[in-house]
Amino acid sequence: MKPVKTIAMVYRETGTCGGIQRGASFQVGQFGEWGFEPVVLSESDLGRGPGRREKLAAAIRGRGVDLVIEHDAYAEEKLSADIAATRDAGVPIIVFWHSVFSWMVANGSRNAGAIFDLLRRADAIIALTSADETFFRMIGCRSLAIPYCDADLMEGFERGGYPHRVLWMGRFVGLKRPLDAIKTVERLRETVRDAELVMLGDGAAGSRAALEKYVRSRPGLRGAVRFEGFRKDVRPYLESAGAGLVTSKFEGFSHATVEMKMASLPVVAYSMPYVETLAEGTGAFQVPQGDVDAAAARLAALFSDPAECARQGALARRSYEAIRSFDQRGAYGRLFADLEKPRSASSLTAPDASRVRLVAETLLEHAGMGLDASAERISRKLSGGGLLAALRRLSRWWR
């Protein structure tokens, strides 16, 4: 393998992939600062159907690319074409896995096995947590955990207090469970009368309207929930909040959690023990998945003790500073150097034995989520009349 100078990054279209777009954009600037030459390729350059393989291989040769980093690893056809293209062009490919390792399992995705088989063919996987790193090594991949290192949005800010304002940030989609955030604050207001919720984000047409309808139907929530939509500048909302809330089914890294920690906010989150930013002693508290009562109780306990809020906020800020101090450049240098070795001689293939149990438990939990997700899809099809309508059409044709 020749020395890495020009790096091509493959990702989805701008504005369609949330954290993936954000991570890829950050990486472009990062590599540029380090003296590499980044080349950005998206679907507008490569397409997503026949011909993608040839287009990527031609771009690699034409632009003198030494290494490809794949940020769009979740569609079987595209990932297969991109791996094949790098083989055609004779350069290594690293897959940047932005999600938790069992994201596809938790979603009930039927092509999860095919994606994992393709990942084994990649030269390496960049993971976001040690649990993800361990999983990919368990299935035979060369992998290294390199967490995001978001810029400090709160530089110069000194927190003066912890108002009873809960901040939730994310997309209005099922896996983020925005309705659970509203229900949590509804319970919280039974003991903390002036508690309120600020929601930053948006979603598909009708998703916000459904949430607003729920709020209007609950007298106890009048004036207590603010829908602020998507905001690029989140600092004012971080400054004015007193605690963060994360109600996700699963996360790969959770930018929202890190931003809350930048602002010295304690964070209450649904249990995701594989996410290191939610570890005990880092200003974060995990409660059982889907348990809005437990989330409300934890927020109430924090708000009832301003000194504890301040202590946990300080831990949260230190947790962010620890992430920020991670040696990103050294980690990438180690990964690039390891690519020069055969996989059998790699130092990045042995799983961390201390995390194997956590990986196994997470896979089992997420397999259960996947079964539930598949059952919900089948139920929606039946209740929506898709199968029944087809049977009726067939019956009419037969008669």
Predicted regions and their residues:
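A charged, aromatic-enriched C-terminal amphipathic alpha-helix characteristic of glycosyltransferases
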Residues: 19, 307-361
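A conserved mid-protein helix/loop that constitutes part of the nucleotide-sugar donor-binding site
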Residues: 21-26, 173-190, 210, 293
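Aromatic "clamp/platform" in nucleotide-sugar-dependent glycosyltransferases that forms part
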Residues: 230, 249
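Conserved acidic donor-binding segment of nucleotide-sugar-dependent glycosyltransferases
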Residues: 284-292, 301-306
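Nucleotide-activated donor-binding/catalytic signature segment of Leloir-type glycosyltransferases, i.e.
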Residues: 210-229
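Conserved donor-binding/catalytic core segment of Leloir-type glycosyltransferases
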Residues: 158-176, 182-185, 198
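Glycosyltransferase donor-sugar binding loop
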Residues: 42-45, 169, 196-210
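Short hydrophobic beta-strand element within catalytic cores of glycosyltransferases
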Residues: 266-269, 276
